[in-house]
């Protein structure tokens, strides 16, 4: 896969001079994602963070970000990871952000949600739980843990405490036939919404993977027709769920997942990706490295903490350094191969970047 390597971006930015920085500075950041930890207590076949993650983001690091969030007019902070609830200071971090006027959104595996449901409902404005099976066997095969009932209990507990989570499903060969059942299960558990995306097998470096990543997660040729039949069925049987937004994606967007899996098999082009996520959001890793999105690493100069970083380094400086400005320019120009096969793109109307959606609606409004 041809890519523009991040270590070349500083030189690229120098070549275009101050014009790039002047015209393409990021002056506002409505959405910031914090990886509270690189550790994870799941053992997913789709992800390698659990194999090597060690670092946590501490309360002091988040406190240092507050002036930058104010300067950049940040409205919403997504706490992710790894598994964010493994960070021993997750509650203090969420409370700090909320106390400073930020909406706080949790993305979790749900393994500890039952234990923390009451506190989570008090601290978060929205919760999204990843759930990749509708029965214990499928869940265990994908997640590597016998924890299906525990996660379902956590979803019910959060709903009972007044904050029904949304459920995010990563469709893959092991679970695509359960597509309609996921909708029924989400309703049974008291979820606010259910959302679907395709497993990312085109980007070998997503989710902490290494260069030797080999996948049998995608649909095979013989699976495409059954999947299309399921899509036809769900459009007919769940019209009201599409209309109400209980199913987050439109029928047309769900069909992009079929197109993606067909493209993996060289049976057509990848669905066109419409995304401007780096223009309104950024991801900050547990060690302070800033990325333009979940799937593309940030350049070396986009660092707000760690060895060799000056104490006055802040988020705005990291976002507008030569390397990050050039990287955003490459993404904007369509020069990053990862973008062409992205399964989780986001688009927000540039005229509405400053609008402040609720945490519960942001993902739906921003989805491409």
Where are the predicted features?
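Radical SAM enzyme [4Fe-4S]-AdoMet core and its adjacent flexible, acidic
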Residues: 1, 57, 123-126, 130-132, ...
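Flexible mid-to-C-terminal extensions adjoining Fe-S/redox cofactors in radical SAM and related proteins
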Residues: 2-23, 27-28, 270-274, 287-368
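Conserved alpha-helical substructure of the radical SAM core
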Residues: 3-119, 126, 219, 223, ...
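Structured beta->alpha junctions
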Residues: 36, 83-86, 110, 131, ...
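Cys/His-rich metal-chelating microdomains
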Residues: 39, 43, 47-50, 278, ...
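Conserved catalytic core of Hanks-type protein kinase domains
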Residues: 39, 130, 318
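Short, flexible helix/strand-to-coil boundary loops that buttress conserved ligand/catalytic motifs
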Residues: 48, 117, 143, 294, ...
């Amino acid at each position: 896969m041809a890519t523009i390597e991040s270590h070349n971006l500083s030189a690229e930015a120098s070549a275009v001079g101050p014009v790039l920085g002047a015209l393409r500075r990021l002056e506002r950041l409505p959405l910031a994602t914090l990886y509270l930890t690189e550790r994870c207590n799941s053992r997913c076949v789709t992800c390698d963070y659990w194999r090597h993650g060690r670092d946590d983001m501490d309360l002091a690091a988040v406190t240092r970000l507050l002036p930058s969030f104010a300067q950049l007019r940040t409205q919403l902070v997504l706490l992710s990871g790894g598994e964010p609830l493994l960070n021993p200071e997750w509650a203090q971090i969420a409370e700090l952000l909320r106390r400073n006027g930020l909406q706080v959104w949790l993305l979790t595996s749900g393994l500890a949600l039952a234990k923390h449901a009451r506190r989570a409902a008090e601290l978060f404005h929205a919760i999204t739980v990843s759930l990749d099976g509708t029965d214990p066997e499928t869940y265990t095969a994908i997640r590597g843990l016998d924890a299906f009932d525990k996660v379902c209990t956590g979803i019910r507990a959060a709903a009972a405490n007044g904050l029904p989570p949304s459920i995010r499903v990563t469709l893959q060969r092991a679970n695509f036939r359960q597509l309609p059942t996921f909708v029924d299960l989400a309703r049974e558990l008291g979820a606010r919404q259910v959302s679907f995306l395709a497993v990312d097998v085109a980007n070998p470096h997503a989710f902490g993977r290494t260069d030797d990543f080999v996948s049998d997660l995608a649909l095979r040729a013989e699976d495409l027709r059954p999947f299309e039949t399921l899509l036809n069925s769900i459009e007919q049987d769940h019209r009201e769920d599409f209309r109400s937004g209980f199913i987050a994606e439109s029928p047309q967007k769900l069909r992009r997942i079929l197109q993606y899996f067909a493209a993996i098999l060289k049976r057509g082009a990848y669905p066109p990706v419409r995304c401007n996520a780096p223009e309104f959001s950024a991801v900050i890793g547990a060690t302070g490295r800033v990325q333009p999105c979940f799937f593309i690493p940030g350049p070396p100069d986009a660092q707000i903490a760690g060895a060799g970083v000056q104490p006055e380094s802040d988020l705005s400086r990291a976002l507008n350094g030569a390397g990050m400005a050039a990287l955003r320019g490459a993404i904007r120009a369509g020069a990053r191969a990862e973008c062409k096969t992205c399964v989780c793109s986001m688009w927000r109307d540039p005229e509405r970047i400053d609008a402040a959606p609720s945490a519960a609606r942001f993902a739906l409004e921003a989805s491409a």
